[in-house]
Curated annotation (Swiss-Prot):
This is Outer membrane protein A. It comes from Klebsiella aerogenes. GO terms for cellular component: cell outer membrane; pore complex. Residues 214-342 form the OmpA-like domain. Keywords: Cell outer membrane, Conjugation, Disulfide bond, Ion transport, Membrane, Porin, Repeat, Signal, Transmembrane, Transmembrane beta strand, Transport. It is found in: Cell outer membrane.
Length: 350
């Protein structure tokens, strides 16, 4: 009982401690182990006869195991153990006892360093016990016992780990059948290979598509070409000029494009009159271009009146009306601003 308590204490020590030598989450591993197997409580019970000779309680033990790592702290493990063959060399009892088993355990681990874990395994073992002796002959028995284990595991490389482990199993065999009912403790060294430990290539997010460029282009036409002085009706040569402009606008074809026609006048006349005249001239241009095929919802008119003169003060000293009309001709104009979005095409990287 004292030995059992010690074994449980060793197993529970797996929680005393912090980075992770355990395999990656949701991966498999497999390995083998070799060690020193010792049977305890090996007295011969059959027919009330005691063994009166040497009993070789310490034997070579071995095993194989495979497991599934759920997360850094929890895994499940299944394994096969050869617990050894224990000879009896007595006068009354002369024979051997051997045992092998399959076990299923939960493996609870906790990191100490980046490549070292301490762990415990808790579960059950299905064993087979065989005995052959001079009194009872050959017998065997099967059963289930709890299994406790504790140890440390060191990640030698990314894929290979080694472990040092002590395992304890109670009551292997039925004394009435195979003559003994020993306990077993095994100290072993194991090596395992972890599958699927490769680092996934980092996923490079595609570069965001560049924002479309806002394009603005302005076409300026002289009002004297489009209209007679002080008029808002297009002249034939003005229509020809707008036909050429329409061709250019059609070739541009900006995405989500729109156009605004701005009408300007000179400073001759009242401000209110010139504002009305600029609006009428801008609308005349819009109506013509819509008739040519530009969608009405993509073009608008705006009268600017006398604002933004391009002549500045160059005509301030001109007094004669005819000369002033000629001097201020650049101020009488129609500007068409076309705005839209242009997709930016980037070359793929080699």
């Amino acid at each position: 009982m004292k030995k059992t308590a010690i074994a449980i204490a060793v197993a529970l020590a797996g929680f005393a401690t912090v980075a992770q030598a355990a395999p990656k989450d949701n991966t498999w591993y497999a390995g083998g182990k070799l060690g020193w197997s010792q049977f305890h409580d090996t007295g011969w019970y059959n027919s009330n006869l005691n063994n009166n000779g040497p009993t070789h309680e310490s034997q070579l033990g071995a095993g194989a195991f495979g497991g599934y790592q759920v997360n850094p702290y929890l895994g499940f493990e299944m394994g096969y153990d050869w617990l050894g063959r224990m000879p009896y060399k007595g006068v009354k009892v002369n024979g051997a006892f051997s045992s092998q088993a399959v076990q299923l355990t939960a493996k609870l681990g906790y990191p100490i360093t980046d490549d070292l874990d301490i762990y415990t395994r808790l579960g059950g073992m299905v064993w087979r016990a065989d005995s052959s002796n001079s009194i009872a002959g050959d017998n065997h028995d099967t059963g289930v016992s709890p299994v406790f284990a504790g140890g440390v595991e060191w990640a030698m490389t990314r894929d290979i780990a080694t472990r040092l482990e002590y395992q304890w199993v109670n009551n292997i065999g039925d004394a009435g059948t195979v003559g003994v009912r020993p306990d077993n403790g095994m100290l072993s060294v194991g090596v395992s290979y972890r599958f699927g430990q490769e680092d996934n290539a980092p996923v490079v997010a595609p570069a965001p598509a560049p924002a479309p460029e806002v394009t603005t282009k302005t076409f300026t036409l002289k009002s004297d070409v489009l209209f007679n002085f002080n008029k808002a009706t297009l002249k034939p040569e003005g229509q020809q000029a707008l036909d050429q402009l329409y061709t250019q606008l059609s070739n541009m074809d900006p995405k989500d494009g729109s156009a605004v026609v701005l009408g300007y006048t000179d400073r001759i006349g009242s401000e209110q009159y010139n504002q009305k005249l600029s609006e009428k001239r801008a609308q005349s241009v819009v109506d013509y271009l819509v008739a040519k095929g530009i969608p009405a919802n993509k073009i608008s008119a705006r009268g600017m009146g006398e604002s933004d003169p391009v002549t500045g003060n160059t005509c301030d000293n001109v007094k004669a009306r005819a000369a002033l009309i000629d001097c201020l001709a650049p101020d009488r104009r129609v500007a068409i601003e076309v705005k839209g979005y242009k997709d930016v095409v980037t070359q793929p990287q080699a």
